[in-house]
């Protein structure tokens, strides 16, 4: 099922645990700034277990998904697939025994996915398919039925779906703009072509950075973002002067 909601992805940091962490404890992966913000919001609502953390290495390397510590009775697993600030991404599709909730705000439509492996995907529009003010939700049918009925309608995913994403007056211009961008994606070759372009553009930058004795990218090369290329300077004094 597909739902368009108002607001940004940050609203999902609280809506997700409100709807799906009413009985069991969710697992959260701390793999960057946005994942960390999601954890801080979820803690206000429910108990949270951090199943992996890359904080100690300053988010420059992430454990393989298969090595995350996830209890079999977790409500769900949440993580951000592409961390914009740290310039790091999770390459693997989820393969958990519990539902996967994935923030794809900064990488949706930039790569091909096996959508069947994801239970809940969310993405704000302003990074890859429009202007701020709308959020795309892709949710499996059985999970939608588990939305918390005790919540006000505006915070309940099922209520939004039942009203065709028009529970209240939607951001019509945001929808219109997203539609224009979706059309452009199709005319430009679709997701596979976008993936080729993302790899090509990011590789050009990484090749320059890696061959330089001036710039540095500290991220594990196998986990570097294709959408957000970060760099520092080898000379910390110059870096401080630049900033």
For each feature predicted by the language model, list its residue ranges:
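Conserved beta-loop-alpha segment that forms the PLP phosphate-binding cup at the N-terminus of a helix
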Residues: 1-26, 35-38
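Solvent-exposed alpha-helices and their adjacent loops that cap or buttress functional pockets
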Residues: 20-21, 68-72, 92-95, 112-116, ...
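Structural motif
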Residues: 27, 76-80, 101, 122, ...
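Active-site phosphate-binding strand-loop segment of PLP-dependent enzymes
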Residues: 42, 53-108
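A short secondary-structure junction signal
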Residues: 60-62, 87-92, 110-116, 132-135, ...
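Conserved active-site segment immediately N-terminal to the catalytic lysine
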Residues: 101, 115-126
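Active-site C-terminal subdomain of aminotransferase-like
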Residues: 125-206
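Conserved PLP-binding catalytic core of the aspartate aminotransferase-like
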Residues: 216-243
């Amino acid at each position: 099922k597909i739902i368009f909601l108002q607001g940004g992805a940050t609203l999902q940091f609280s809506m997700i645990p409100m709807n799906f962490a009413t009985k069991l404890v969710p697992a959260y992966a701390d793999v960057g700034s946005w994942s960390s913000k999601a954890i801080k919001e979820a803690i206000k609502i429910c108990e949270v277990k951090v199943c992996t953390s890359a904080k100690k290495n300053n988010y420059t390397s992430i454990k393989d998904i298969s090595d995350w510590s996830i209890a079999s009775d977790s409500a769900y697993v949440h993580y951000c697939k592409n961390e914009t600030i740290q310039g790091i991404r999770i390459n693997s599709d989820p393969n958990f025994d519990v539902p996967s909730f994935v923030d794809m705000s900064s990488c949706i439509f930039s790569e091909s996915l096996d959508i069947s492996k994801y239970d809940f995907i969310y993405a704000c529009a302003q990074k890859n398919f429009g202007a701020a003010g709308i959020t795309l939700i892709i949710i499996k049918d059985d999970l939608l039925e588990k939305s918390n009925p005790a919540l006000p309608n505006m915070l309940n995913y099922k209520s939004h779906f039942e009203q065709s994403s028009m529970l209240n007056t939607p951001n019509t211009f945001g929808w219109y703009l997203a539609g224009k961008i979706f059309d452009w994606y199709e005319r430009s070759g679709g997701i596979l072509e976008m993936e080729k372009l993302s790899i090509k553009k990011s590789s050009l930058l990484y090749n320059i950075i890696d061959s330089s004795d001036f710039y540095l990218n500290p991220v594990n090369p196998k986990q570097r973002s294709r959408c957000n290329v970060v760099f520092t300077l080898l000379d910390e004094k110059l870096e401080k002067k630049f900033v």
